[in-house]
Amino acid sequence: MIQQALLSVSDKTGIVDFARALHERGVKLLSTGGTAKLLAESSLPVTEVADYTGFPEMLDGRVKTLHPKVHGGILARRDLPEHMAALSEHSIPTIDLLVVNLYPFQQTVAKDECSLADAIENIDIGGPTMLRSAAKNHRDVTVIVDPADYATVLAEMQANNNTVGYETNFMLAKKVFAHTAQYDGAITNYLTSLGADKSHSTRSAYPQTLNLAFDKVQEMRYGENPHQSAAFYRDLKAVDGALANYKQLQGKELSYNNIADADAAWECVKSFDAAHGAACVIIKHANPCGVAIGGTAQEAYEKAFKTDSTSAFGGIIAFNVPLDEAAAQVVAKQFVEVLIAPGFSEGARAVFAAKQNVRVLEIPLGKGVNAYDFKRVGGGLLVQSPDAKNVQPSELRVVTKRHPTPKEMDDLMFAWRVAKFVKSNAIVFCGGGMTLGVGAGQMSRVDSARIASIKAQNAGLTLAGSAVASDAFFPFRDGLDVVVDAGASCVIQPGGSVRDDEVIAAADERNVAMIFTGTRHFRH
């Protein structure tokens, strides 16, 4: 039974209401510093820990709760007579509920102006110590580190005469150890990222020891293949607009491949500014098989679908604008695995309600960029910054005698945006705000060019006057000749080959405009 609680929080969300509910249930309140002041100002009877222990806070608040009367009351096992006798001998009451969250270390070090001294002062000592003590003794002590759990604990106390059951206590204890591990990991990441110089003026983006924290969202029926097991974890620091922030409105449980493909679709469609019109991306096996922009979501979808209607079967479809009923009616005619948008009208929701197997995901648009991209290798982890660079007009360099027309320039920039999301080697034909042919994942660039041309022919789309993007340079003129033979009138590529002069001469020979971006977009 909970008779005495200690509350000491940095995040004071909901703490007054929770403390008042505890008081109304006859629970004695202990607290420290700012939390005690807030509770007292809220007319709640609270005892300062310094008064409770008879030992004042010292060292500018560094020592508040590190006292046997606190930790003895938390750690004593109620089922061991010798533990209870020791408490009695030293006049130590039990502490049955601990509510603690920690100094905001991660928020502090995220600030550009943060110094090492600032970071050190925000390393919590007493908080983690109490949390670990309470979590260790979870058979007898309820411990809360997350304000979201106040309601759960209070409801259980109200239903069971101030008692919280073992299952809830165990769940809360696991949450504590995950939280303190993450907290210590953040400290390690920060300290090992600092340079060895005494001023610590340099800080690496890649700490010597890298600690990552993820929460399990779901276990899956299987992984990439049926013989593989799998689960999906959410980054505790997932940025705004990340796929992991999805809300599933309907449909079957997402599979491993659904999530992988949905991420590719969502990242691609987010790269198109909704302020300039609707965009639609159709993904199959993590590659775009159709991308388009239009005045409406319906127009964008219909154009994207034309690129490769065969591959679009059972694909993942993403929009950068809310989906209305008109677009939903058209999309619903096809077999769709996953549908993603930042919102859905009531009419659109009603259309897909009749197709309950379709997984419908709502994700808010966001500009945030992940700190890292990861790739697992045998016995290690490759870590890099995300490929978030958008080429600026000032970085473009026309290298041919003929300059692209304004229409060609629009098509080139569209093609370049798409090529970034196509597996290397990538060749993308575009025109009129849509993809016309996509060549992906080939070992030679010329083969990707040939495949992209064939895909356009199969779809009945003309490549005359089209724009072509290549994610990396043309190593020889053969790739350029293939796309020009297919009908391309302009090309955008990074440049950087030892044979750039040969490729430029070939473009001039064929009266093709060509732009170098100076940026490569390999994707593996």
Curated annotation (Swiss-Prot):
Cysteines joined through disulfide linkages: none
Q: Which CDD domains does this one have?
A: IMPCH (cd01421)
User: What Gene3D superfamilies does this protein's entry cite?
Assistant: 3.40.140.20, Methylglyoxal synthase-like domain
A single GO cellular-component term from the record reads:
cytosol
Recall the GO molecular function terms of this protein's record. IMP cyclohydrolase activity; phosphoribosylaminoimidazolecarboxamide formyltransferase activity
Give the comment on domains: The IMP cyclohydrolase activity resides in the N-terminal region.
Q: What name does UniProt use for this protein?
A: Bifunctional purine biosynthesis protein PurH
